Amino acid sequence: METLLLNDSKKIDDIKLIFESNEININLKNLIHIEDISSKTTGIIILRELKPSYLKPFVDYSIKKNIKVLAVGRALISLINTLKGTNEKVYRSFSGDRSTFISLGSRLAEIIGGAGPLKTNYLNSYEIPIENMPNNFLPSSINLNNGCIEAIELEGKGNIMGIIWPIFSSNKMPSRFEN
């Protein structure tokens, strides 16, 4: 099994260290061309904004072959534009707060082990209004203050998820759920 980091050779060593420090065995490789995807590929990580025309073949191939895709941070903007077939500005300046809501029954809730309201450990500089949600996607998490998207996932078949949180930074996302 291998996981591919899409066109981000500058960060690959940092990402490998994060996995290693958490005792997660990962075969992480840099991906530049669609031809670089092998039959052993199980996931693709996207960490930065990319042009929708560049990203689209990777997303389409991933859906066809059921390869997991995770778009992190500003890569979520690229993912949304790719899925909507546009290059428009889908974000605005951040007006929310550190409160978020993880949707019950979402894949995100399965991954982190719970759903409901929680506090994140950061304030972002941008937000994505809910009206920019691509077709066939569900909000996995929304900001409780402003209702903006913090995470999305493909409904039904497929394993595509995008999250606004900087999970590969030292500033981690939710530490606990609120009661």
Predicted regions and their residues:
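Conserved catalytic-site region of short-chain dehydrogenase/reductase
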Residues: 77-79
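Acidic/charged, solvent-exposed loop-and-adjacent secondary-structure segments enriched in E/D, K/R, S/T
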Residues: 88-89
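N-terminal beta1-alpha1 cap of cysteine-dependent amidohydrolase-like domains
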Residues: 1-74, 84, 93-105, 109-115, ...
